């Protein structure tokens, strides 16, 4: 977030632009749940505000996301790659009733994936979107810094 001075007064506001992506594996898993892209974008908004459930190392964060009609406690867990900048990548998701957590081997693989995704240059990122490796779900700037979900079709 970059502070912006507004109208020569003491009022400050922030303008944030960030993009949210799903890996192909995560998008496939998402279709099997009742979770929506809007809920995922709202979860990113919470993480930007500092509401992170766990930092797993290697730029991988864990975030609980509520399924419709259920609270966060019994819903899904998502693993997200970010350097807390303008790019956020959903890597992996699971329902709490399916498994307790990822294994150390899975976490290491996810950390390596996170590193490679976060190191993508802009043209490489656009190529990954074009070939379906990544799907973008949020890419907007709003005065509050909140992402507006992109329509999926």
How should each PLM-predicted stretch be described?
Residues 13-14, 28, 47-49, 87, ...:
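Preference for short coil/turn "hinge" residues that link or interrupt alpha-helices
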Residues 4, 23-24, 38, 59, ...:
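Surface-exposed loop/turn and secondary-structure junction residues enriched for glycine/proline
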Residues 1-35, 127-153:
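Arg/Lys-rich, positively charged N-terminal/basic patches that mediate binding to nucleic acids
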Residues 7, 81-140:
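Enriched for short, Lys/Arg-rich terminal
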Residues 19-67:
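N-terminal first-folded block
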Residues 49-54, 63-71, 102, 114-118, ...:
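Short amphipathic alpha-helical patches
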